[in-house]
Curated annotation (Swiss-Prot):
Belongs to the ScpA family. It comes from Oceanobacillus iheyensis (strain DSM 14371 / CIP 107618 / JCM 11309 / KCTC 3954 / HTE831). GO terms for cellular component: cytoplasm. NCBIfam families: PRK00104.1-4. Keywords: Cell cycle, Cell division, Chromosome partition, Cytoplasm. The keyword Nucleotide-binding does not apply. Component of a cohesin-like complex composed of ScpA, ScpB and the Smc homodimer, in which ScpA and ScpB bind to the head domain of Smc. The presence of the three proteins is required for the association of the complex with DNA. One of its GO terms (biological process) is DNA replication. Participates in chromosomal partition during cell division. May act via the formation of a condensin-like complex containing Smc and ScpB that pull DNA away from mid-cell into both cell halves. It is found in: Cytoplasm. This is Segregation and condensation protein A. It comes from the Bacteria. PANTHER family: SEGREGATION AND CONDENSATION PROTEIN A.
Amino acid sequence: MHEGYKVKLDTFEGPLDLLLHLINQFEIDIYDIPVAQITQQYMEYIHTMQHLELNIASEYLVMASTLLAIKSQMLLPKQELEDDLDEEYMEDPREELMQRLIEYRKYKEIAERLKEKESEDNQLYTRPPVVFEFKDIPEKITTNQTDISIFDMVGALKNMLKRKEWTEPHDTTVQRMDIPIETRMKEVLQQVQSNSDGLVFDKLFPSPTKNYIVVTFVAVLELMKDKQIYAVQERHFEELYLYSMEEST
């Protein structure tokens, strides 16, 4: 796959973000993490990103190894653990990861509050007076456009591939880009703009070929980054809809 079409995840904080995303998505108790479940879901995301040939930072793979190690340790018989460790030094194998997640979640919450305060201050000092009328209220109420993360998008693609159950196999290699990314971006944007009530994400993938899936997914991410479209998902695991930013203004 051409280097220019790879999507970098460096702008996202890393594997702890993905783990928190999964914990929220599956409504998991952060103080009692089901390691087998979270490891399976985490690995599915990693495999999907690898399938798309995304640039995955090494930290994601280190976390995958950590999860697998914790999972293996928890599968050991209790007596074997007691033989290896003095009882007073025994602790939950998940403890360190749990503490990292709790601290990181606190950091994110503080950062989000600071971001909201900064936004409020900017509106207070720079926003001109506006007269609101009922006719200005849009009929279509959507969720916060910033709520959708790269992990939501990868998850939507992962679930779409499962739902589609292609009758023909995917290509296993990307030999060349049959569709230039700029061309596919224009096609996707036109398709989204022609559906003012929202375009179901799955509708962008009529072809099971890997070339088509990768270039379409990258086109969607680029359009979102350029603030030409945005995504809405009312609830976890439900269909994801794409809207044109022009429709929301």
